[in-house]
From Swiss-Prot:
Its cofactor is a divalent metal cation. The keyword Cytoplasm applies. InterPro entries: ATP-NAD_kinase_N (IPR017438), ATP-NAD_kinase_PpnK-typ_C (IPR017437), NAD/diacylglycerol_kinase_sf (IPR016064), NADK (IPR002504). SUPFAM superfamilies: NAD kinase/diacylglycerol kinase-like. It comes from Shewanella sp. (strain MR-4). GO terms for cellular component: cytoplasm. Keywords: ATP-binding, Cytoplasm, Kinase, NAD, NADP, Nucleotide-binding, Transferase. This is NAD kinase.
């Protein structure tokens, strides 16, 4: 028997300007990364000289020397007005899944590859960050996903994702069979290597590599992207962000299936399980330098052509 869910429609939040200044700032970074450590040291010194209270995430605090206030990620969320993540999008995603439950702004310094979520350059962050700290910034809310695995009607595992929740085989890729329902309405059965359910934030990540469309961050939508479907007619589909996605795994599948959240957290799935993916009540409060332009980011990161005239 399937599980029925009441679908509610939360209010959308648009990008807004903020003028609130910050007092307590948290520093988060990729552990054991020389470039990240260098940037974190510069940030800590620069912020401390200006009189800010600075808390450093405990996994990187020991690498920054003495006179460092080390705390865990939950304490950064509870105590800080602003969290600065130094690293790539993966580091931002890991921090965001925790910080989204708190009312803390998050901004990134790019020490990764593409860096869709990390705006500030690592070697010249001071000018842009100074303006942000003076209240010259834009705030953008990005919604998260909640993924749940049910077995015989009982919740077995759950977690959140900023980018995507992916149903897939375990360590060895192979075709799996499952049914997909949107708001308890049957959409189709699928034979594929898996299914990506992505937010607009994640539409430039794994979903893009699998042939999905790019969704602008302000869209209240989800995109479902099949992975190597065994039919030529199967294409990605965009649905309302308030939709509840249910995937029912065929009892004929082998074991060792998983649901991955942002590629970081893995939930075990058995044949016959039901996977529910829906919009989370949590939102990431991203801070951008004032005048942030999403299409400039796409041109820069994806190598799109510049203006002709």
């Amino acid at each position: 028997m399937g599980i029925n869910f009441d679908v509610s429609r939360p209010k959308a939040r648009s990008s807004i300007n903020m003028t609130t200044k910050f007092h307590t700032i948290g520093l988060i970074g990729k552990p054991h990364h020389p470039g990240t450590n260098q940037t974190l040291k510069r940030l800590h010194h620069w912020l401390t000289v200006q009189g800010y209270e600075v808390l450093v995430e405990e996994r990187v605090a020991s690498e920054l020397g003495t006179h460092i206030v080390a705390v865990d990620l939950l304490e950064i969320g509870a105590r800080c007005d602003l969290a600065i993540v130094v690293g790539g999008d993966g580091n931002m995603l890991g921090a965001a899944r925790v910080l989204a439950r708190f009312d803390v702004g998050v901004i990134g310094v790019n020490r990764g590859n593409l860096g869709f979520l990390t705006d500030l350059p690592p070697d010249a962050f001071e000018e842009a960050l100074a303006k942000v700290l003076d209240g010259e910034f834009d705030t953008e809310h990005r919604f998260l996903l909640e993924a749940e695995v049910y077995r015989h009607g009982m919740l077995k595992a759950s977690n959140t994702a900023v980018n995507e929740a992916v149903l897939h085989p375990g360590k060895i890729a192979h075709m799996i069979e499952f049914e997909v329902y949107i708001d308890n309405q049957f959409m189709y059965s699928q034979r594929a290597d898996g299914m990506i359910v992505s937010t607009p934030t994640g539409s430039t990540a794994y979903a893009l590599s699998a042939g999905g469309a790019i969704l602008t961050p302000n869209l209240q939508a989800l995109i479902l992207v099949p992975m190597f479907p065994h039919t030529l007619s199967c294409r990605p589909i965009v649905v309302d962000a308030c939709s509840t996605i249910k995937m029912v795994v065929s009892p004929e599948n082998g074991e060792n299936l998983e649901v991955s959240c942002d590629g970081h957290v893995h939930l075990a799935v058995l044949p016959g399980d039901e996977i529910i993916v829906r919009r989370s009540s949590e939102q990431l409060r991203l801070i951008h330098p004032k005048g942030h332009n999403y299409f400039h980011v796409l041109r820069s990161k994806l190598g799109w052509g510049s203006k002709l005239f």
